[in-house]
Regions:
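N-terminal leader/targeting and assembly helices and adjacent pre-domain segments
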Residues: 1-134, 138-145
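Acidic, glycine-rich two-metal-ion catalytic cores of nucleic acid-processing enzymes
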Residues: 128-197
Length: 197
């Protein structure tokens, strides 16, 4: 819930900034003119989600800890931090890239008309805030958790993929479960190294 609200806050701030830009500028023809370069754009989302993603990754690391003595929160945090780049990349592919693609299409569709572009931007951000965030944020949280769990695995640890028979159907999860016990750092049959499938 918190991650969803944080993401929606970034989207709202970003939309307001874009609309201000469109009111006070010459014709906008490039994506960078309204949201900045991709790396800069991605940092806004990664920064907003970082505390929640770190907590999810640490929880994942804690879930697969198998030695007799529970490591300190610091040790778990250090292990999970090794996955932060991969988690950030998932945020980019889940939110930033699709959003940039939609905005880029809107710029092309507006053909230099800032008023038309403003209308299209409102539609894009409304869709993201009302629909896409809710569809995307759970996968991001699950991926952070899964990456945290992956961080504490060693190549000699045996792991099995389990799926919830009462949960939604997932062919990849079922295929992965058929592989049985595998070395902890090996990819499952579908290519996944961690949940979710």
């Amino acid at each position: 819930l918190t991650m969803g609200r944080k993401t929606k806050r970034v989207l709202a701030d970003e939309q307001n900034q874009i609309l201000d830009t469109l009111r006070g500028r010459a014709v906008v023809k490039t994506l960078d003119a309204i949201v900045g370069p991709k790396a800069e754009h991605a940092k806004r989302y990664s920064a907003a989600l970082a505390p929640s993603l770190k907590s999810a990754a640490v929880a994942g690391a804690r879930s697969l800890h198998t030695t007799g003595v529970m490591p300190s929160d610091r040790e778990l945090s250090d292990a999970a931090a090794k996955q932060s780049k991969a988690i950030d990349e998932f945020v980019v592919t889940s939110i930033v890239e699709p959003l940039r693609e939609r905005l880029s299409r809107s710029i092309s569709q507006a053909s230099g008309d800032n008023a038309e572009l403003a209308k299209l931007v409102r539609v894009v951000y409304r869709e993201w805030k009302n629909q896409m965030v809710d569809e995307t944020i759970d996968d991001i949280a699950y991926t952070a958790y899964g990456r945290g769990a992956l961080a504490v695995l060693t190549p000699d640890m045996k792991v099995c993929w389990k799926f919830d028979p009462a949960g939604p159907a997932c062919a990849d999860a079922e295929d992965n479960s058929l592989a049985g016990a595998m070395n902890g750092c090996d990819a499952f049959p579908t290519g996944h190294t961690h949940a979710p499938a």
